[in-house]
Amino acid sequence: MTVNKKLAIFDLDHTILKCNSDHSWLDYLINKGFIRREEYLEQNAEFQKKFREGNVNYKEYYEFTIQYLKDNSDDYISDIRSDFMKEIIEPSINIYALRLIHKHYEKNEELLLASGTTSIIAGPIAKRLEFKNVVCTTCEKENNIYTGRIEDPPSLGEGKLK
């Protein structure tokens, strides 16, 4: 017996959320003192310049944005991320998007969250919103310790399909 279900695909940033979750996460880490503001802003400005010129290497950019993870366990990051979810993400959830998500659930449709956001943030948000299917940029781990690298390909454009 074949069951045909409709698939509803949602983006995360400025759709389900009223913010850019990766940028909000980095701002949060800077404001809490986990990342040095001056160092981050200087390096980020260089990436933004390359982006405007059309020369940005997204893998390098993502790995720059997750360097703070390197050599840390998910348990360590989990406590920090939990506070971030309460303080930043919960108030940023778009109530209209949430209603739409629930309408799809009520129709027994499959839902997919497809985002360029890193797994460190997209995963917990997907869990909070009860998405079973998630495509995001995956932060690499070895023995439950973050390496500071991402798995190829980044979840942008065609990378969301691979």
Predicted regions span which residues?
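Active-site neighborhood of HAD-like aspartate-dependent phosphohydrolases
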Residues: 1-53
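Short, compositionally biased "basic patch" segments
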Residues: 49-53, 58-74, 133-140
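Metal-dependent phosphoesterase signature
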Residues: 60-96
